[in-house]
A protein has these predicted regions:
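N-terminal signal-anchor transmembrane helix
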Residues: 81-157
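Soluble catalytic domains of enzymes that build or remodel membrane lipids, polysaccharides, and related
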Residues: 125-364
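Non-catalytic terminal accessory segments
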Residues: 1-111
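A short, polar/charged loop/turn motif at coil->beta-strand junctions and beta-hairpin connectors
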Residues: 17-22, 115, 126-129, 234
Length: 364
C-alpha cells in the first residue's frame, strides 16, 4: 500500500466520520473529530513515509476534494427534512458536487489536455526561418500512451530542432535499469520524426542517465552538461549552450555563456537550462537571442486573476507561469511542461494545461 492510497483512505474515513455526525446534526463535533482523525492519520503516515512539503500539500488537497464534500453532504442530509432549516441548505450538495467535479477534472482530465503554445520571434540577424519545439518535465516513472501522444504532437509540428529542458524522468535510481529501455524507445520514436534533439538535465533526473540514453539512441540526440553545440538549419547557424542544473555560475557554465556571446553576429544563439533563473546569469543579456527553460510546470495550479501561488523559481510569477517574456532585457521562454510533480505530491493540474512550445524564428 503506497502513500497515495493511504492518504486517500484516511480522507475517506475522515469524511465519513464528519459526514455521519453532520447528518445527525452534530456538525461542529463531527468536524472536530474528523480533524483529529486527520491529524492522527497524518502523523501515522509520517512514520511510514516521512512527509515532505509536497506530502503535506497532498494531505490538504485530498481533505479538500474528498473529506469536505462528504461533510457537506452529511450536513445536507441532516437539514433536508427540517422545515426550520434555511433554504440555503440546498447549496450544500451543489457545493459538494462542484468540489468533487473540480477534483476529478484536476486529477484525471487537465493533466492530459496537451496544449501547443506558439510564439514568433522576428530577428534581423538570421537569414532563414528556424522552428524549435520546446519540451520539458515529462517527469514520469514510466512511459505510457500519453508520452507517445506528446511525441506525436511534436513530430506533427515539423520542427528543425527539439530542445528538452530537463526532468525527463522521476524515479528512484535503483529503478532506472528497468525503465531505461522504455525511455530509450520513447526518444528513438521521437527521433524518427525530427532532425535532432538537444537535452539538459533537471532536478528529478541525472546526467549519467542522459549519457546512457544518448549512447543508445544515436548521434542525432545530444546531452549538454555545461557545454555548447553548433548546428545548421539550412544555411542558418544555430549555437546552443546547455547549462547544467548543478552549481550556479561555475567556470564551465561561464565558458558556455562566453561561447554564446562570442558567436558570429549571424548566428542564432540559445541558452538552454532547466531552471528559469538561468536568465539571471552574468552575460546572459550580452547578445543571447533566447533563454529556454522549464522546471516550474507553470505552477501546476493557477488562481484566476492571480496566477500560480507556488512556482519554486526566482523569476517573476508571470514568467514562471509560462510563455515568452523578457527579463532584464533577455527574451526567455518558459514551458509549462507536459508532466507533473510525482512522489509525494498530489498529481494534478488546474488552470495550467500541460504544453509544448513551438517557437518560430523568422528573418526581419
Amino acid at each position: 500500500m503506497g502513500l497515495s492510497f493511504y492518504l486517500l483512505l484516511l480522507c475517506i474515513v475522515s469524511g465519513l466520520v464528519s459526514g455521519v455526525m453532520a447528518m445527525r446534526r452534530k456538525a461542529v463535533l463531527g468536524a472536530a473529530v474528523a480533524m483529529l482523525v486527520g491529524i492522527a492519520g497524518t502523523i501515522g503516515a509520517n512514520r511510514l513515509w516521512p512527509l515532505d512539503g509536497f506530502g503535506l500539500i497532498h494531505v490538504f488537497y485530498l481533505a479538500a476534494v474528498v473529506s469536505l464534500p462528504m461533510f457537506l453532504v452529511g450536513g445536507w442530509f441532516g437539514l433536508r427534512r427540517d422545515d426550520r432549516a434555511p433554504r440555503s441548505r440546498w447549496l450544500l450538495p451543489a457545493v459538494a458536487t462542484s468540489i468533487v467535479a473540480v477534483g476529478i477534472y484536476a486529477t484525471h482530465i487537465e493533466p492530459y489536455r496537451l496544449e501547443i503554445v506558439r510564439e514568433q520571434i522576428v530577428s534581423a540577424q538570421i537569414s532563414e526561418p528556424v522552428r524549435i519545439v520546446v519540451l520539458s518535465d515529462i517527469q514520469n516513472s514510466s512511459v505510457g500512451d500519453y508520452e507517445y501522444e506528446v511525441m506525436d504532437a511534436i513530430i506533427a509540428e515539423e520542427p528543425d530542432l527539439v530542445l528538452m529542458a530537463g526532468d525527463l524522468w522521476q524515479l528512484p535510481p535503483w529503478e532506472w535499469p528497468q525503465q531505461i529501455h522504455d525511455f530509450e524507445d520513447l526518444l528513438a520514436y521521437l527521433l524518427e520524426g525530427v532532425p535532432g534533439l538537444v537535452m539538459v538535465d533537471g532536478d528529478s533526473d541525472w546526467p549519467d542517465g542522459y549519457d546512457q540514453l544518448v549512447q543508445r539512441v544515436g548521434p542525432r540526440s545530444l546531452f549538454l552538461f555545461d557545454e555548447t553545440s553548433e548546428t545548421f538549419v539550412g544555411d542558418q547557424r544555430v549555437v546552443i549552450g546547455g547549462a547544467a542544473r548543478g552549481e550556479d555560475n561555475s567556470p564551465a557554465e561561464r565558458a558556455v555563456l562566453e561561447t554564446l556571446v562570442a558567436a558570429p553576429d549571424d548566428a542564432l544563439t540559445i541558452l538552454l537550462g532547466h531552471r528559469p533563473a538561468v536568465v539571471f546569469r552574468p552575460d546572459a543579456s550580452d547578445g543571447i537571442d533566447l533563454v529556454v527553460a522549464g522546471h516550474t510546470h507553470g505552477g501546476q495550479v493557477s488562481v484566476p486573476f492571480f496566477g500560480p501561488p507556488i512556482t519554486f523559481s526566482e523569476v517573476p510569477r508571470e514568467v514562471a507561469a509560462g510563455g515568452l517574456h523578457e527579463v532584464d532585457g533577455v527574451p526567455i521562454f518558459v514551458t509549462r511542461g507536459v508532466g507533473m510533480e510525482r512522489h509525494q505530491a498530489p498529481q494534478l493540474r488546474f488552470n495550467v494545461r500541460p504544453s509544448i512550445g513551438v517557437i518560430d524564428f523568422v528573418p526581419d
